[in-house]
């Protein structure tokens, strides 16, 4: 599937890079 596009965390900001990198900050990631 689109696992590559889903690489970003749901609660994290995703950079518009290719491949997109997950900028995980403390946003309820418990």
UniProtKB/Swiss-Prot annotation:
GO terms for cellular component: extracellular region. The keyword Disulfide bond applies. This is Bowman-Birk type proteinase inhibitor 2. Keywords: Disulfide bond, Protease inhibitor, Serine protease inhibitor. Belongs to the Bowman-Birk serine protease inhibitor family. Gene3D superfamilies: Cysteine Protease (Bromelain) Inhibitor, subunit H. Inhibits trypsin (IC(50)=24.3 nM) and, to a lesser extent, alpha-chymotrypsin (IC(50)=0.51 uM). The record marks 16-17 as: Reactive bond for trypsin. Disulfide bonds join 9-24, 14-22. One of its GO terms (molecular function) is serine-type endopeptidase inhibitor activity. GO terms for biological process: negative regulation of endopeptidase activity.
């Amino acid at each position: 599937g689109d696992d590559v596009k889903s690489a970003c965390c749901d609660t994290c900001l995703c950079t518009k890079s290719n491949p997109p990198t997950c900028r995980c900050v403390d946003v309820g990631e418990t």
